[in-house]
Design a protein with these regions (language model features):
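PLD/PLD-like phosphodiesterase catalytic module centered on the HKD motif
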Residues: 1-174
Length: 174
């Protein structure tokens, strides 16, 4: 059991260390609904993602607006063009994840996202709303193999800036 505050906010709460990483490490499903998504999110808690994807056989299901960084588009192209399904294993994913330590950008990130897509560990759905609107929900649900879940809702997007450098607020629900 992990104890969490009812809400987190501001830069002083260290939301990666006190919320995101501990929950991710115990989960095998992460469902996220956001306006903005960037691949840099995978670089903020690599050891937690290792537990999630490798140890827990986790799956990340994402719904987002059509506005995401070029690395995601590049990863889709690589996903379609490069990888041979028989060559992809959790060991390949693990080695790719190890390369991400202390990185935020670059070809290692594109490769990692491509592997996630190929292994069906990352599922991205695009939410479209009538113009000039923008899909802008920000909800997250973590679940484990025992049926436990925890959710959160607030201002935070699934981006490096959202989790690391912005002053964001969200509420936690058991």
């Amino acid at each position: 059991d992990i104890n969490f505050k009812a809400s987190y906010g501001g830069l002083s709460d260290n939301i990666i260390q006190n919320f995101y990483a501990p929950v991710l490490e115990e989960s095998n499903i992460y469902k996220r609904s956001v306006a903005y998504f960037t691949g840099g999110i995978f670089c903020i808690a690599t050891s937690a993602y290792k537990s999630f994807f490798i140890d827990n056989n986790g799956k990340f299901q994402l719904v987002t607006s059509p506005f995401f960084d070029e690395k995601i588009s590049d990863a889709y192209k690589k996903y379609e063009d490069v990888f041979n399904q028989e060559d992809l294993t959790l060991d390949v994913l693990n080695k790719s994840l190890e390369k991400l330590e202390n990185l935020q950008h670059g070809s290692d990130l594109i490769e990692f996202i491509s592997i996630l897509l190929n292994l069906n560990k990352l599922e991205i759905k695009i939410a479209l709303v009538p113009e000039p609107g923008l899909y802008h929900e920000k909800i997250g649900i973590f679940a484990d193999s025992y049926g436990n879940s925890i959710s959160f809702s607030g201002s935070i997007n699934e981006t490096w800036s959202g989790w690391i450098s912005n002053s964001e607020e969200f509420k936690v629900f058991n």
